[in-house]
Swiss-Prot record:
Function text: Plays a role in cell envelope biogenesis, maintenance of cell envelope integrity and membrane homeostasis.
Keywords, comma-separated and alphabetical: Cell inner membrane, Cell membrane, Membrane, Transmembrane, Transmembrane helix
GO CC terms: plasma membrane
Source organism (scientific name): Rickettsia prowazekii (strain Madrid E)
Disulfide bonds: none
Gene designation per UniProt: yciB
Pfam families the UniProt entry points to: IspA (PF04279)
Name of this protein: Inner membrane-spanning protein YciB
Bilayer topology term: Multi-pass membrane protein
Subcellular location: Cell inner membrane
Domain of life: Bacteria
């Protein structure tokens, strides 16, 4: 639950900051503060922070600080694209190398045949590359307000749909001692 809150909390803070706090600059500041709090809480409670969270936070801090200093919202808008491309490369390369990164993230929930982890890695890579393109299209062609709404009401449902579409693979290829 804490991990979910640490991922969603900064997005909610960004959304609230944009609509109730006065635009992208304030939203970026709120998101940075919330992210610092969430990472700190995760570390205090779990004594660790995941590699993906470290990558996400690093890109967020760099793009967020540049946005705040420069006053140019482009930097916070390209943050998702940068993250999606990085994650896409990680999942693609781990599939190619037959050492699927996604296995380490999900193995405590589901145990799969090795070839299924590789398929899931490729699918996840494709999903992240797709999301990078979608983010670029939305931020470059629509208003700030539309982009912010898309971040909450578009990305989350699209991600949920992607996860649901993976269920047949997971259920068909799970090992007998799997939790799902």
């Amino acid at each position: 639950m804490l991990k979910l809150l640490s991922e969603i909390g900064p997005v909610i803070a960004f959304f609230a900051g944009f609509f109730y706090g006065g635009g992208i600059q304030n939203a970026t500041l709120y998101m940075l503060i919330t992210s610092i709090i969430c990472i700190t809480l995760c570390y205090i409670i779990d004594k660790k922070v995941s590699k993906l969270s470290i990558i996400s936070s690093t890109v967020l801090f760099i793009s967020g600080i540049i946005t705040l200093i420069s006053g140019d919202s482009m930097y916070i808008k390209i943050k998702p694209t940068i993250l999606y491309v990085i994650f896409g490369i990680i999942f693609l390369m781990s599939g190619i190398k037959k050492n699927p990164f996604i296995k380490y993230a999900l193995e405590s929930i589901v145990r799969l045949k090795e070839e299924s982890w590789i398929i899931l890695s490729y699918r996840t890579a494709a999903f992240f590359f797709f999301m990078a393109v979608v983010n670029e299209v939305v931020w470059r062609n629509f208003s700030d307000e539309t982009w912010v709404k898309f971040k909450v009401f578009g990305v989350i449902p699209i991600t949920f749909i992607f996860i649901l579409l993976q269920l047949p693979l997971l259920l068909k290829n799970k090992l007998p001692d799997s939790k799902i």
